[in-house]
């Protein structure tokens, strides 16, 4: 059938379930993709990379023999990845200190690019500051694999947001109040996206998730 298909909620699988939720937001209180400003700090909540590891284990691109809580690596990572973090209360208060945010579904780099394109800015990401799950150390994952999963893995459903440097203390205080881990991982700037590790350009060969 020659019908154009538009939208990001597409899959190669035989079954597709779409759920739509609608609501209202007070004027000026929306966290948008197009509000990042030069010199804003870049933050993420929680940790990154564990869902991506589950995918790699599922496809057998990575093999790990270590068990956690009596579970093989794939079962453990998959089950833990299905527990989606609830950041709603934190996000409701975050609007007082940030105008720009989205959730990380297709990978940090891919979703950050959505912000950069809509806001017409560039960014610097410091790889050594990315928050990694403790399982990476337990499984003794190679550092390059850890970095790749954090940058491109996807499925984290953590918040990626920007905010003026003057708001850092308030943001960290808010994070403490709601027991949410928040990490500052970079800076909004003019130009393009730069990914650095200890000040040196990080080699980029990978892509975030693409629906097709």
Task: Place the predicted regions along the sequence by residue.
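Glycine-rich anion-binding loops of enzyme active sites
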Residues: 1-63, 187
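Glycine-/charge-enriched secondary-structure boundary and capping motifs
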Residues: 1-6, 11-15, 22, 27-28, ...
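Phosphate-binding glycine-rich loops and adjacent basic patches that engage nucleotide phosphates
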Residues: 37-38, 42-50, 70-79, 130-137
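Active-site phosphate/oxyanion-binding loops
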Residues: 60, 64-76, 138-143
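Polyanion-binding loop/helix "lid" in catalytic or ligand-binding cores
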Residues: 69-114
């Amino acid at each position: 059938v020659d019908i154009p298909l538009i939208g990001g909620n597409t899959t190669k699988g035989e079954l597709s379930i779409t759920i739509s939720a609608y609501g209202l937001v007070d004027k000026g209180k929306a966290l948008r993709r197009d509000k990042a400003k030069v010199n804003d700090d870049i933050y993420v909540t929680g940790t990154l990379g564990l869902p991506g590891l589950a995918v790699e284990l599922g496809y057998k691109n990575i093999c790990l023999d270590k068990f956690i809580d009596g579970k093989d690596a794939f079962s453990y990572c998959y089950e833990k990845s299905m527990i989606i973090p609830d950041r709603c209360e934190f996000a409701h208060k975050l609007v007082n200190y940030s105008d720009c945010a989205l959730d990380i579904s297709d990978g940090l780099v891919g979703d950050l690019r959505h912000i950069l394109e809509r806001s017409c800015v560039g960014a610097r990401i410091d790889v050594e500051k990315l928050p990694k799950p403790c399982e990476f150390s337990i499984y003794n994952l190679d550092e390059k694999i850890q970095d790749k999963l954090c940058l491109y893995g996807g499925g984290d459903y953590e918040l990626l947001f920007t905010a003026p440097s003057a708001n850092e203390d308030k943001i960290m205080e808010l994070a403490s109040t709601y027991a949410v881990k928040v990490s500052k991982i970079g800076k909004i700037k003019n130009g393009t996206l730069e990914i650095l590790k200890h000040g040196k350009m990080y080699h980029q060969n990978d892509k975030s998730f693409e629906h097709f």
